[in-house]
């Protein structure tokens, strides 16, 4: 299982006062909706306020995440689904989303929870989407990472 050794996503984080935007791609709707639901559950449990911004796909996640953070969000949870096909498109989109989201976090100084699934097939996504029968909940994990980092940055910055 790819989630083996993950930090304690069940650890309670106090997200009171944090404004978080879930930025989610629309491709592979069933998986994407599962990721969103997991992120929502985590943010709700932490007491954070949140909203959702939908974008066409994972390639658009960085620019929308940057806009959300520049508009005042304390953190972003970026969720997307990229499934390998028969062309190099998978590699280009995966690299662009990953590199772009990393730059957004570094340039804004605000956390971006990375919930972009890069998959060989749809079954892998369904297994990670936090749906009934899934073994993992990557949407919840990405939201937890964004919240935990926002809290840590708040403490570091005094």
Swiss-Prot record:
Q: What is this protein called?
A: 6,7-dimethyl-8-ribityllumazine synthase
Gene name linked to the record: ribH
Q: Which family does it belong to?
A: Belongs to the DMRL synthase family.
Gene3D superfamilies of this UniProt entry?
Answer: Lumazine/riboflavin synthase
Quick one: which pathway?
Cofactor biosynthesis; riboflavin biosynthesis; riboflavin from 2-hydroxy-3-oxobutyl phosphate and 5-amino-6-(D-ribitylamino)uracil: step 1/2
GO annotation, biological process? riboflavin biosynthetic process
Question: Which keywords belong to this entry?
Answer: Riboflavin biosynthesis, Transferase
Q: Kindly give the NCBIfam families that the UniProt entry links to this protein.
A: lumazine-synth
Q: Which residues form the active site?
A: 89 (proton donor)
Output the superkingdom of the source species.
Answer: Bacteria
An annotated GO cellular component of this protein is:
riboflavin synthase complex
**Residues reported to bind (2S)-2-hydroxy-3-oxobutyl phosphate:** 86-87, 128
InterPro entries found in the cross-reference section: LS, LS/RS, LS/RS_sf
Q: Where 5-amino-6-(D-ribitylamino)uracil is bound, by residue?
A: 27, 58-60, 81-83, 114
Q: Which organism is it from?
A: Leifsonia xyli subsp. xyli (strain CTCB07)
Q: What's an example of a GO molecular-function annotation for this chain?
A: 6,7-dimethyl-8-ribityllumazine synthase activity
Q: Name one Pfam family in it.
A: DMRL_synthase
State the reactions this protein catalyses: (2S)-2-hydroxy-3-oxobutyl phosphate + 5-amino-6-(D-ribitylamino)uracil = 6,7-dimethyl-8-(1-D-ribityl)lumazine + phosphate + 2 H2O + H(+)
Record function comment: Catalyzes the formation of 6,7-dimethyl-8-ribityllumazine by condensation of 5-amino-6-(D-ribitylamino)uracil with 3,4-dihydroxy-2-butanone 4-phosphate. This is the penultimate step in the biosynthesis of riboflavin.
Entry EC number(s): 2.5.1.78
Record's keyword annotation contains Ligase:
no
């Amino acid at each position: 299982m790819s989630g083996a050794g993950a930090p304690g996503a069940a650890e309670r984080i106090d997200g009171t006062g944090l404004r978080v935007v879930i930025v989610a791609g629309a491709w592979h709707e069933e998986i994407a909706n599962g990721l969103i639901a997991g992120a929502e559950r985590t943010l709700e449990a932490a007491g954070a306020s949140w909203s959702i911004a939908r974008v066409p796909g994972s390639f658009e996640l960085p620019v929308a995440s940057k806009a959300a953070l520049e508009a005042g969000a304390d953190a972003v949870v970026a969720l997307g689904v990229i499934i390998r096909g028969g062309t190099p498109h998978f590699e280009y989109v995966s690299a662009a989303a990953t590199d772009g989201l990393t730059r957004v976090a570094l340039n804004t100084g605000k956390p971006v929870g990375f919930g972009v699934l890069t998959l060989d097939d749809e079954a892998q996504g369904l297994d990670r989407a936090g749906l009934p029968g899934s073994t993992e909940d990557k949407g919840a994990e990405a939201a937890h990472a964004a919240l935990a980092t926002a809290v840590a940055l708040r403490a570091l910055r005094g």
